[in-house]
Each structure stands twice: as structure tokens, then as C-alpha cells.
Amino acid sequence: MSLLSVMPATTAQQSRAEQVAHHFHWPLVAVEALCPTPLLLWVGPTGLALKSADGKHQHPITAQLQGGSIGLAGPDSWVRGQPLARAVGIKGQHTPTVVDATAGLGGDGWLMARMGCSMHWAERVPLMGLLLQEGLEQAHQDAQRAEVARRVTLHQADAIQLLQNMQEPPQVVYLDPMFPHEGKGSLPRKAMVQLRQLAGEDQDLPQLFELAMATAEQRVVLKRPLKAPLLTRAKPNFQLKGRSTRFDVYATG
């Protein structure tokens, strides 16, 4: 049984909705028809959005790739001193090449690109990859964000295959296996459970971590819940902690 259906907002979006549904083998629902699945991919005039089919949720999920470049000076320059930037090794003019091996909805990956990193995003979940592609296409068309979008290469593929086949190894591999948090801008609790089912579990995370350690030229960064145990017996070289999360940093070179 499918957990996701595709619905056009109006008949003007019918053609694109049909294309998406056919390509991914998702059920297509007529405009304003009763949705037979708990999750709904809404094809609207401004793009794609993920919704809860019960209609109770008012904050659809999209890949919100907002904001332009963050330089060494300016109102947002303080971000370059935050734990994420320090974890991946952004310092002054140095902005490493990073593989975001679990891109998700692009939050951290976009922030790294804003700070100047050359990014490779890997996302194997078709729904997430589709939302990322949509977000990047919109960013390319926006004057403020186009420069950042050009720093990002999206790979709708398994990160293990990507790392095995890259001609030039990245300086950093970034792993964030945590699923999007509940709260403002997320789906209701029941729908989040269903979305996790749709995405599947990262059963191969230990294998991905080992490959990342063998591939990254400088370091592997693993984002974890603040109080979560270490992923492996190997201890990180250092940790950077925030309010609810931490970054375990493993040097490779």
C-alpha cells in the first residue's frame, strides 16, 4: 500500500502531476478529491510541497533553500563561527569540498554552500530528492541565491555508490542521519511517523561511515542528538556541542 499520493492544485498543474506520479509510480488523485493515502505531494503553481492528507497541517514541507552567500563580513558573518562551520573546517577563506551524504531537505547542506563550500548532495529517497531538485531549480532562478545554487551538485543516488565512484575524493564527508525534527514547519506526529516509513531506516550507516573515513581527505563530520551514544567504538578527535545536537569530528588526514 502506498503512503503517498500526488495531487494537482488546479487543472493547470494536471500535466506535471501526471508526469511526477508516472515517473515515481505514485497514485494520482484528482483535484480536491479524497486522498487515499496519509501523505500528499501537492503540485501547486509555485512548486511541490508535502502535506498531511487529513488537511489539518498548515505548514507544508518543502526544501527551503533560503538566503544568499555569507561572506567574511556582513550581517550574517557570525554564522561562520558557529559549530557547523567549525566542524567542517570553514576558516577564513578556506571552504572545503563537502559531500553531504544524507542531504535530507538540504538545511545544513545549503548553509555550507552559503558559506562558500563546494557541495555534493547525495539523497537516495526519491521524495526528498524531488523536493531538493525543486528547491535548487527555484534557487537558480533567484538573483540572490543563484550563486549559492551553483555551488551545489545534487546526486539522487545512494551515498555509498557516490563515494565509491567519485573521481576526486572530497575533503570532508558530512553525515546527518537524524530525521527532520518535529515542531513548527513539520508534519503532525502521525504523519512524521509515516514519512519516516516512506524514507526507510539508515541500516547501512555504519558501512557509510567506514567508507567516508576511507574517502575523505581531511575529516568526517557526524551530526548526532546531543546525548546520543557514539556511532562506533572509534572516538572522535573532537566534538562541538549545541543545545540539542552535537558534531562528532573524525580526522582522516
UniProtKB/Swiss-Prot annotation:
GO terms for molecular function: rRNA (guanine-N2-)-methyltransferase activity. The keyword Glycoprotein does not apply. It is found in: Cytoplasm. It holds the Pfam family SAM_MT. Disulfide bonds: none annotated. S-adenosyl-L-methionine binds at E123, R124, D176. The keyword Nucleotide-binding does not apply. Its EC number is 2.1.1.242. It catalyses: guanosine(1516) in 16S rRNA + S-adenosyl-L-methionine = N(2)-methylguanosine(1516) in 16S rRNA + S-adenosyl-L-homocysteine + H(+). Keywords: Cytoplasm, Methyltransferase, rRNA processing, S-adenosyl-L-methionine, Transferase. InterPro entries: 16SrRNA_methylTrfase_J (IPR007536), SAM-dependent_MTases_sf (IPR029063). Specifically methylates the guanosine in position 1516 of 16S rRNA. HAMAP family: 16SrRNA_methyltr_J. This is Ribosomal RNA small subunit methyltransferase J. It comes from Magnetococcus marinus (strain ATCC BAA-1437 / JCM 17883 / MC-1). The gene is rsmJ.
